[in-house]
Design a protein with these regions (language model features):
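N-terminal helix-turn-helix DNA-binding core of bacterial DNA-binding proteins
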Residues: 1-41, 53, 61-68, 74
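Amphipathic alpha-helical dimerization/coiled-coil segments
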Residues: 17-18, 22, 68-71, 75-94
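Short, hydrophobic-biased segments on the C-terminal half of alpha helices
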Residues: 47-48
Length: 94
């Protein structure tokens, strides 16, 4: 249930999606730009929660940390694949 708790928090799935879609580590500001309208404090909180859950990690590159999904995060995206397929089908019927 803790995983659903984390994934149900506002912006969490969007952060995971953007980290996955980027394909390479991404800096905080770039990630914030991709997540339209998210405050820096909320993004910081979500990244911390995802790091503590083992879903995301940061790598120091120069002076800025860059964020990426861990192997566990990649597994999560794979597990969510059927949900994405269902949501596309649902959207087409609306």
């Amino acid at each position: 249930m803790a995983a659903l708790d984390l994934l149900g928090r506002r912006w969490t799935l969007r952060v995971i999606w953007e980290l996955h879609g980027n394909g390479a580590p991404i800096g905080f500001r770039d990630l914030q730009r991709r997540c339209d309208g998210m405050s820096s404090s909320v993004l910081s909180r979500r990244l911390t929660e995802l790091r503590e859950a083992g879903i995301a990690a940061s790598t120091a590159t120069a002076a800025q940390p860059a964020w990426h999904l861990t192997a566990l995060g990649d597994d999560l995206v794979t597990a969510m694949g059927p949900l994405l397929d269902w949501s596309r089908s649902w959207a087409e019927r609306r």
